Structure formats: structure tokens, C-alpha cells
Amino acid sequence: MTWYEGFLTKILHILIIIKFANFTPHTIVLNGGVELPSVGVARVANTFSAFDANGVCDVHFGDIQGLPEPQEDTLFVVSALVLSAAKAAGRTDCVAPATGHPECVRKDGFIVSVPGFVR
């Protein structure tokens, strides 16, 4: 068994034991073909300053919206921005698609599938 097959076996094992709840606006497709449809959308609230003379403004991030309270045996799939905010808030039950991983599959510049998740 190659390391990749071993990794996929571990992912499939986790999928059986742990429930993944996708709170991104898109269906997440794993390289092995497993699809996780969106069940909601978690976002980070934001406010913007006025634009300066160069057309640049500041963004200020606030609380996470649309993310349920922690649930036993559940990992919430969220965007990288939401994951960062969740980690800052002490949440350990969130992951994001591994879109920057070298095994991420792209076609015509768009992500087709990811090999797994990042914590």
C-alpha cells in the first residue's frame, strides 16, 4: 500500500467515525470521489472603512455567523477565514478544505477536488 492509499484509507475511516458537516457555500469533493454537500454557510462578519484617495479601505472582522455550537463526533468544514476565526475563538471542531495542498486537483484554473482537510 502506498502512503497515498494509506492516507485515503484513513480519510475513509474518519468519514465513517466522524461526521463532516459542510458549512461552505459549495459541495466539497474529495479526490477519492466522496462529495460533501453544503448544509449551511458559516461566515465571518465584517465592516469596512471609507475608501481613501487611492481607493483602498480597511476591513475589520467580527464574529462568526452561521456556525452551530460544537456537536459530538462532528467536524465542521468551513472556509479558511472562518477556520482562522474559529481557532482564535478556541474552537477545535473546524477544518477547511486543503486547497493549497499539492494533491489538490485543478482543471482550467478551478479546484475540482481536494485530498482532505486542514486543521
Model region roles, listed by residue range:
Residues 3, 7-19, 23-27, 31-119:
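Intrinsically disordered, low-complexity segments enriched in small/polar residues
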